[in-house]
Amino acid sequence: MTNDMTKGAITPLLIRFTIPLVLGNLFQLTYNAADSIIVGKFVGEEALAAVGTSNPLMTLAILFINGMCLGTGILVSTAFGAGDTRLVERQVSTTAIAGTVFSLAFSALCVILATPLLQLMQVPTDILPIAVNYLRIVFAGLIFTFFYNFLAATMRALGDSKSALYFLMISSVLNIGGDLFFVEVLNWGSNGCALSTVISEALCCVLCVLYIRWKVPILQLGRRWLVFDGSLLRKTVSYGWASAMQQATVQLGKIAVQAIVNTMGVSTMAAFTAASRIDDFAYTPQQNIGHAMTTLMAQNRGAGKHDRVKQGFLCGMRIEGVYGVLIAVVCFGGAPFIMKLFVTDPEVIHLGVRFLRTVSLFYLMPAFTNGIQGFFRGVGDLKVTLVSSTINMLFRAAAAAVFVLMWKLEIEALPYSYVVGWVVMLAYELPLLVRYLRSHEDEL
């Protein structure tokens, strides 16, 4: 099933495409959050802190792989918009072969480096063994992470954002069930949560492959899955590397902040872990709207419909703004109730509420940065997204270090460091956006 986004009313197209992306990511966050909830409820505070401090490294690896797939998706969208089916086939087969080799090597490297990376993050020695075991299990399953993200990104590039959602919903339910079985029944602790996550991702891959063979003729390549195009690989690496580095840079900034949080005590670590998961729920739809803008713009750019590129950007920014206001109200008002879903300790809940209520006041800022990044990805200028993300994270980490290590501020220092990063990011992106729109005024 494919969806031609070069025709039809833009706002309904964006909304219909975005909703499955949002739901899919919310389900993914749900089964990630299930690890924290179940570990926090059934294992204890130390295990929750270990899972939380492992999460930035785990997410870094996953986002790096996802970034490579996102870069490929932009090229597939452009080729599909231009009607070049043969190019779509070569792009998909080349990425599948190269990605398999890369993800296996990357998985082995991550398993080997798990301990020194956690030590670099200043993880307390009493929870280090728990964190190492959790990470190694997740890292061992990165091949499944690649294939799911690759197949899902390809289907989204063809305009189908619904199919991957259905697979992810099934996988999420199984992951939560697996968490309960491995942790509560078998008493495997955080290792059981990690194993459940890997099994769920493997199932997602199988379901995607079966669906593609049944429903997506353009991807039923047969022997053409073995086609490897070196020239396409170079272009794929160029797009994929920029996108992967952008995703990785964001996560490296989070890791730097996590290292600072690790100096603030186990209660603050646990509160930050739970509050960050909630913040991810709020923030992810903003990214999804940006990704929907990217797909729409890339398809229309490939088709030469530049007027729809500008219309797509303006519609997307309006959607981002409305969502930013709504989620800020929900997170500010519902912070105490939401925190109680994750933990029972009153001190941890209090700290988490303070974090959430502070950061929610500024949710319009990442809404706009994500919309602008979606625009630049869609027009093929991934350098802007990489540089702006790098600037954001450098200033965020530096501000967190000053606020916490030098000024000795408490948990509110962390969301204020986010604001510093967003302000600098917008200061970089806005002039470039205005310059691009003016220089392409005849086309747009």
Q: What is each PLM-predicted segment?
A:
Residues 39-59, 125-130, 190-193, 232-239, ...:
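Interfacial/gating helices of multi-pass transporter permease domains
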Residues 1-18, 76-141, 185-241, 297-362, ...:
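Short alpha-helical transmembrane segments in multi-pass integral membrane proteins
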Residues 69, 137-156, 164-172, 193-208, ...:
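Short runs within selected transmembrane alpha-helices of multi-pass transporters and secretion channels
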Residues 5-42, 56-71, 75, 100-107, ...:
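N-terminal transmembrane alpha-helices
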Residues 48-108, 145-164, 271-335, 366-380, ...:
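Small-residue-rich hydrophobic transmembrane alpha-helices
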Residues 16-35, 137, 148, 171, ...:
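Transmembrane helical elements of multi-pass membrane transporters/channels
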Residues 60-63, 175-179, 204-209, 281-284, ...:
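Hydrophobic transmembrane alpha-helices of multi-pass small-molecule transporters
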Residues 26, 30-49, 118-125, 181-188, ...:
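Helix-terminus/linker motif at the lipid-water interface of multi-pass membrane proteins
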